From Swiss-Prot:
One of the record's GO cellular component terms: ribosome
InterPro entries, per database record: Ribosomal_bL9, Ribosomal_bL9/RNase_H1_N, Ribosomal_bL9_bac/chp, Ribosomal_bL9_C, Ribosomal_bL9_C_sf, Ribosomal_bL9_N, Ribosomal_bL9_N_sf
HAMAP family associated with the record: Ribosomal_bL9
Domain of life: Bacteria
A GO BP annotation: translation
PROSITE patterns: RIBOSOMAL_L9
Family the UniProt entry places it in: Belongs to the bacterial ribosomal protein bL9 family.
General function of this protein: Binds to the 23S rRNA.
Name this polypeptide is given: Large ribosomal subunit protein bL9
Primary gene name: rplI
Cited NCBIfam families: L9 (TIGR00158)
Keywords: Ribonucleoprotein, Ribosomal protein, RNA-binding, rRNA-binding
A molecular function (GO) term: structural constituent of ribosome
A Pfam match: Ribosomal_L9_C
Length: 150
């Protein structure tokens, strides 16, 4: 299916690009999330009229993400979990836990934006975690998992 992108999509293209994707990806993800429209002649003409407005909105989102990224980059956060004497956690620290911790600290972050390269954290200690605030803004933070031997 030919679609026109209404915003930058990772591994696909930038605002205004006309790309061919599988029908299911377009119908089930891109179009419902308002990231793309079918590339009909009418849609392309309408997009060209709204192009400046959409580019302005995209630039504002990027600027806001960069501002938050500057505050967040390199920061360290602590989370306490129950653990055994050998340093292994009972359970794990997931991206949802990290997103909740960041929200309490005043940062608006969804759990899908938190990337944990090694998967959920299962040991006490310091761990590096990435937060993707925008497709172009990815910052590194440190999560210090403290064990509660109670």
């Amino acid at each position: 299916m030919q679609i026109i992108l209404l915003e930058k999509v990772a591994n696909l293209g930038n605002l205004g690009d006309i790309v061919k994707v599988k029908d299911g990806y377009a119908r089930n993800f891109l179009i419902p999330n308002r990231k793309a429209r079918r590339a009909t002649k009418e849609a392309i003409a309408e997009f060209e009229v709204r192009r400046a407005e959409l580019e302005k909105i995209a630039a504002e989102k990027l600027a806001a993400s960069q501002a938050v990224g500057e505050k967040l980059n390199g920061q360290s956060f602590e989370i306490t979990q129950k653990s055994g004497v050998d340093g292994r956690l009972f359970g794990s620290v997931t991206n949802g836990d990290v997103a909740e911790l960041l929200k309490k600290a005043g940062f608006e972050v969804e759990k899908l934006q938190v990337r944990m390269p090694e998967g959920p954290l299962k040991m006490i200690g310091e761990h590096s975690v990435q937060v993707a605030l925008h497709t172009d803004v990815v910052v590194d933070i440190t999560i210090n998992v403290i064990g509660d031997h109670a």
